[in-house]
A protein has these predicted regions:
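Active-site loop architecture of trypsin-fold serine endopeptidases
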Residues: 48-56
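N-terminal organellar transit peptides
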Residues: 1-31, 42-46, 58-217
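Alpha-helix C-terminal capping segments
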Residues: 36-41
Length: 217
């Protein structure tokens, strides 16, 4: 959620600068994905795109009974009564469940408000469909969560038109997702010198240009 909101803040800055943000949902754009999509000026989806899932949930596993059967005891030293509130070794108290529910509700309300503001929808209407349900792109369009049916190229064309670009050869700059440790270990980055060299060069070019592009994963 934190990462989603950080990206959303950058999207707000882009929109505030006067640059339109056009969204192409692709196969799936649900939950946090829709949180971000709702920040766009115009949203394209395919009829069978999986989207929606507006809501928040938190779960945890309690293995207390299993530990008892195995004869394993968990001992802890903590600074406060609720420091281990989501520990798998004990159940939550009624008070703690209320605490967690309050936190979930707070994030949920932020989600609903974000969608209502971004889509210019009545908050109560958003709440009526913000029960975690998933939707197809077509269903989302009927509910006002998506603007039009279309693919990546439709979105690209619309973005060019919104930016006053009339040429058939629309200039597009793609940004990679970076290289993770998992990717390195799995062989995703087969040429590390090339990968890191390119990253360094890109960083230098961005520094010279005085701009910075956030990396979104």
């Amino acid at each position: 959620t934190g990462a989603t909101q950080e990206i959303a803040e950058e999207m707000d800055k882009i929109r505030s600068s006067g640059k339109p943000i056009i969204i192409s949902m692709g196969d799936m754009c649900a939950s946090a994905g829709y949180w971000l999509a709702s920040k766009g000026n115009y949203i394209f989806a395919s009829p069978a795109t999986i989207t929606g899932s507006i809501g928040v949930y938190m779960d945890y596993t309690n293995v207390e009974d299993l530990m008892d059967k195995l004869g394993i005891k968990n001992e802890k030293i903590k600074s406060g009564a609720h420091k281990d509130i989501l520990s798998m070794y004990r159940p939550m108290t009624g008070e703690e469940k209320e605490m967690v529910q309050t936190m979930v509700d707070d994030i949920y309300n932020q989600f609903v408000q974000t969608v209502a503001d971004g889509r210019k929808m009545d908050e109560n209407k958003v709440r009526s469909i913000a029960d975690g349900r998933i939707l197809t792109g077509k269903q989302a369009q009927d509910l006002g969560l998506v603007d039009a049916m279309g693919n990546y190229y439709d979105a690209l064309s619309y973005a060019a038109s919104s930016g006053g670009i009339q040429s058939e050869n629309i200039p597009v700059k793609s940004y990679g997702t970076g290289v993770s440790l998992k990717g390195i270990l799995s062989g995703e980055a087969r040429n590390l010198s090339g990968v890191f060299g390119k990253a360094l060069a890109d960083s230098f070019k961005e520094s010279v240009a005085g701009s910075s592009v956030p990396s979104m994963k």
